[in-house]
């Protein structure tokens, strides 16, 4: 990276740090720890619309301000695997009428492991002729990529040419964790910064003991590494594919103290308070757990008031936020009972407005 690029990167990072610090200042937060990103080739996911122009066909994106389309032949934010695939894929699709007909979008999902899933989205139904062409495409791409899979999507249709997931291997504090990342399910896009987030969370919980509750646990991104520090971990997640991936990940990482339940945060709150029983909690007696710590990684809207009141029951709260504005709103209530002991900024998306943040809250007194 040139000195000019480094300067540009640092300037946008400094602006984010100032913005987060201002939002956290009413809560007497300590100085924010900052975890930078590679300025390019950091994204493990990318999606593009496809534009047809005569015999040509290319990826496009839309300018966020003008809404004008522009051609994208390479995409510096995406990892090198995705960039390599973009050119090679279109070179194969352009002359192939079966693969290009009514193709309107291409999604890429990759991993530090080098695995790749390419999803081709169509405005037409896909038949056996398409599947044969897609298998041939996969064989051709396999000469360049060690493990590549193709998915065809159309209305109410999904054809998978071998797998709809990548197997990721994340290095975290000297351990390697295996994760199945499923196409069209949420995963952290910036794998290297994600590792830093997990390591920060591990540092937060190092002195703690007892059991951990994680809400919005996804495929176990935090639950699994943190299981090494707690007696037991219970994770809640509403998305069925993520729950299934989490079960696979628990087995792959040989963890015996983690349970994932398919409940919304609001439902789990009701179960904890004994207001409702759920068949999905069969075999799990919540009263037997000694939950000392809760980790939440909510969507952009933050936590609802009932969930906030529920997590106030725990001595330690690790809050991962993809929206610092709603984090600050939630802290107004949480700060009645807890102090901000640590704060961190993770630059998941360089050169964008987006901030990923983390705070550790500990009970007052």
UniProtKB/Swiss-Prot annotation:
Which reaction(s) are listed as its catalytic activity?
A: uridine(54) in tRNA + S-adenosyl-L-methionine = 5-methyluridine(54) in tRNA + S-adenosyl-L-homocysteine + H(+); uridine(341) in tmRNA + S-adenosyl-L-methionine = 5-methyluridine(341) in tmRNA + S-adenosyl-L-homocysteine + H(+)
Which one Pfam family would you cite for this protein? tRNA_U5-meth_tr
Q: Which domain of life, per UniProt?
A: Bacteria
A biological process (GO) of this protein is:
tRNA methylation
Look up keyword tRNA processing and say if it applies. Answer: yes
GO terms, molecular function: rRNA binding; tRNA (uracil(54)-C5)-methyltransferase activity, S-adenosyl methionine-dependent; tRNA binding
Enzyme kind, highest EC tier: transferase
Give the intrachain disulfide bonds. Answer: none
| Signal peptide bounds | none
- The answer to whether the entry has keyword Acetylation is no
Q: Which residues bind S-adenosyl-L-methionine?
A: 188, 216, 221, 237, 297
Instruction: Report the EC code(s) recorded for this entry.
Output: 2.1.1.-, 2.1.1.35
What does the record give as the active site? 322, 356
**Gene Ontology CC terms:** cytosol
What UniProt keywords are attached to this protein's entry?
Methyltransferase, S-adenosyl-L-methionine, Transferase, tRNA processing
Entry's family note: Belongs to the class I-like SAM-binding methyltransferase superfamily. RNA M5U methyltransferase family. TrmA subfamily.
Task: Relate the protein's function as given in its record.
Answer: Dual-specificity methyltransferase that catalyzes the formation of 5-methyluridine at position 54 (m5U54) in all tRNAs, and that of position 341 (m5U341) in tmRNA (transfer-mRNA).
Q: What is this protein called?
A: tRNA/tmRNA (uracil-C(5))-methyltransferase
Name the encoding gene, please: trmA
């Amino acid at each position: 990276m040139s000195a000019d690029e480094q300067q540009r990167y640092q300037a946008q990072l400094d602006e984010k740090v100032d913005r987060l610090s201002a939002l956290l200042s009413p809560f007497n937060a300590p100085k924010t720890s900052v975890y930078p990103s590679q300025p390019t080739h950091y994204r493990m996911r990318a999606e593009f619309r496809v534009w047809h122009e005569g015999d040509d066909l290319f990826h496009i994106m839309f300018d966020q301000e003008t809404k004008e389309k522009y051609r994208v032949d390479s995409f510096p934010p995406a990892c090198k695997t995705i960039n390599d695939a973009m050119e090679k894929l279109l070179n194969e699709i352009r002359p192939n009428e079966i693969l290009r007909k009514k193709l309107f979008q291409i999604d890429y999902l990759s991993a530090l492991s080098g695995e790749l899933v390419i999803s081709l989205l169509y405005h037409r139904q896909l038949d056996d002729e398409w599947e044969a062409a897609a298998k041939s495409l996969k064989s051709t791409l396999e000469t360049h990529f060690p493990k590549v899979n193709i998915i065809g999507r159309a209305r109410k249709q999904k054809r998978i040419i071998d797998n709809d997931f990548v197997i990721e291997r994340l290095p975290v504090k000297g351990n390697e964790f295996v994760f199945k990342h499923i196409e069209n399910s949420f995963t952290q896009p910036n794998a290297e910064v994600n590792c830093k987030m997990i390591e920060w969370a591990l540092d937060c919980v190092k002195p703690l003991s007892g059991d951990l509750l994680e809400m919005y646990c996804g495929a176990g991104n935090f639950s699994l590494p943190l299981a090494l520090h707690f007696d037991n971990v219970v994770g809640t997640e509403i998305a069925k594919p993520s729950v299934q991936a989490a079960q696979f990940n628990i087995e792959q990482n040989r963890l015996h103290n983690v349970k994932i339940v398919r409940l919304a945060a609001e439902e789990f709150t009701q179960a904890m308070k004994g207001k409702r029983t759920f068949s999905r909690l069969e075999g799990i007696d919540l009263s037997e757990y000694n939950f000392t710590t809760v980790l939440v990684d909510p969507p952009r809207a933050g936590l609802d008031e009932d969930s906030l009141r529920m997590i106030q029951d725990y001595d330690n709260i690790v809050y991962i936020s993809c929206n610092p504005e709603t984090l600050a709103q939630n802290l107004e209530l949480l700060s009645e009972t807890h102090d901000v002991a640590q704060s961190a900024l993770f630059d998941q998306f360089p050169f964008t407005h987006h901030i990923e943040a983390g705070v550790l809250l500990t009970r007052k007194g």
